[in-house]
Amino acid sequence: EGVGISEGNSISSIEFEFNGWGNNYELNNQTIKLSHVSESSIPDNSYPDYRDLTLSNTLTVISDFDLRISSSRNWVQITFDTPFVWNGSDNILISWENRDGTWASNYGYVEGSSSFSNRSARPVSGGSQTPDP
């Protein structure tokens, strides 16, 4: 059983802790997708490579949204347009796609935990290079 969620229950939002961002930094045209994944870890690559993962039920839970980071360290809750139903057994892969195409200085990072040694990220530019889980 997942932390606070049982099989068949819906996930309708997610929270991230943003750190080091300039006040009122804007993230435009963002998309978040969730997938069931049977593997217990992500390959140790310098960028997301989902080709060797067994993904199912990939769902765009929110797309084309804008986000403003109000302070340099802040928890932000993102409510999904479409809830994701967890199957009760698989892990969940969260894919965040920045489809804005531009960037500005004063961007920061999203806090993580050192217990997640198999996480990865890759900056991508241009719509044709966006990883597709």
Set out the residue ranges of the language-model regions.
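Intrinsically disordered, low-complexity boundary segments flanking structured domains
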Residues: N19-G22, G108-Y109, S128
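Aromatic- and Gly/Pro-enriched, solvent-exposed loop/edge beta-strand patches characteristic
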Residues: N28-F116
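Small cysteine-rich, disulfide-bonded extracellular modules of the LU/uPAR three-finger superfamily
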Residues: S10-E15, S40-I42, L53, D132-P133
